[in-house]
Amino acid sequence: GNVNTQNVTAKTEVDIDAANNITASGNLTSTNANVDLKAKGGSITTNGTVNAHNNVIANANGNINTNGDVTATNGNAVLNSSAGSVTTKKVTAGQAVDIDAQQDITANGNLTSNNGEITLDARSGSITTQGTVNALNNVIANANGDINTIGDVTAANGKAKLNSSTGNVNTGNVTANNDVDIDAANNITASGNLTSTNANVDLKANGGSITTNGTVTAHDDVIANANGDINTNDDVTSTNANVDLNAGGSVTTQNVTADQAVDIDAAQDITANGNLTSTNANVDLDAGGSITTSGEVKAQQNVEYNAKGSITTKGIINSTAGNIHLQTDAAQGDITFGGDVTAEHGNINIDVLQNGNVTDNDNKFTALGDKGAINSGNFKLQIKGAGDVDLHEIYATNNALIDVANGNLTLAKIDGNLVALQLKTEGMQLKVGELIAGTKIIAQGSDIDLNKIQQRLDADGLLTIVPDGAQPDKPIDNLKIGEIITNKGVRFEHLWLNNGSIKVSEGMFHIDKLVVNNVAHFSNKHMKTAVWGAPPQRDGSDSAYWNNIAVNNPAQNLDEWQQEGTNPNKWMYLHFTAQPNIQHSNGALLDLRNYDYVYDQRFTAVDHMLQQLNENKAEEYDINHAPVVAQYFRYDLYDLDEEDSKSEPAKITVEA
């Protein structure tokens, strides 16, 4: 049958057994021992308090409802429903609180274990705790259905483990001295803070998403794995280890900070609305979609962006002692920078593996390192498909390289020991406001406009420039270099172009191999030179040359053309020396201004033509070219005094 009681008080045991139900309308109290309730075939209901000096044990086949507080002062509080649910108010134990139910567990009051652990097990149902769950050691909750902890969950010296095998887990604050471990078959939602004082925070949503609305802080690792999205709407911090966020959907974060690595992987997009910081290791972002970082991204070692969509940065990217690498692999994988990018002792690499533009908002890219090193101080940007590059400023201790398969390149300023700018499709424009280099410049494209070139002040020797067309077997269509300032001089290994102009303000100026199809102008502070491939015209140049483009086309001799040094038997060379008004060239000299010199010295084509028009060749030069300068004087001849010319030859005496 049933047992129905009012108040029951005993110095030792209070022991109530019923074949069916137990209902206690009053208080049940054992001042020095246990309260033991057993309803073999029914339910247990206590409407008053249940107090025991030692243990409170309730076992029922049906439901257990404790509508008053349950206290086991020095022992355990054990509530077990083999076929039903358990519903409680406050439950307090000196040792463990252990609540098992076949169906649901609902705690409408606080659950407290002063010296032990709290275990909640809903084998076929859900768990809901309205109040706090506080244990000296572990807090463990296992449910087949949902777990909802509305009040704070605290495991002062142990771990907090919440596991839903088929449902969701929703929490408030969860704090543990050891691990905070939350597993859900579906979604995890933390409305409060998740804190592990001395271990890890581990979140796993096997079939759903993870959302944290409070902070997530761990002494060691913070690990979140979700089949769906991960949204961390407050700060995530690993004090001494890693933060690892892995989503089958998208990842959205605020600030993420780790002593070691920050590793975020998403099958779709990554959006970091706060800062991403690795104090002693790497920041690694890998997205099957796009990546957007709105805050600062800082790492002691490497920073890596890898996206199957586009990349957008709105804050700075900084690596103290590693490399920075951004890569897209998409039909349209643009990379847009909104902050400076600095590798304090490493390389910067930007790769667009398919198509996409690379642009910034007046930012600076800085790659610093040891001089001559390949592992630091280098900048490299590559677009393998179609896309334009438009960047403000680039500085590299060593090499600064940009390679674009099919697009335009626009730079305000670039500075590197070696600078290589390569556009490999005809019709694209390469435009640079200021280019600073130490030893060498490689410029490739069909339309090249370099406003100002300056050599690094600490550079030794001549600055070497290697210009080429978009294709090696095609000339540059248009080349314009507004000004070149060097420490000693500049040397072009070869130059094949249709049209162009180059001005050197400081230093010597050498072109080892030169082919001009139409017309190009070259000048220093003292002389302006025109070189014609088309029929020449007077244009006010101090010297003018013609090169025969019908012979020795560079396209037919690429190996020889690209070798260093002159090849005077095949191609023209042009050297402006350190001495004013002096050139060395083997070109067909058309015209030369008075008091300018070209070595080896020779008559110009204009001189020859004028001489043929005037039978009095001695007077021709005075009449037609320079009336006040004798022709022979112009060619380094000098006049002998008339008396000297009439004197007797000098005698030579040889003594034996």
Regions found by a protein language model. Give the residues of each.
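Long, low-complexity, polar and repeat-rich extracellular regions
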Residues: 1-656
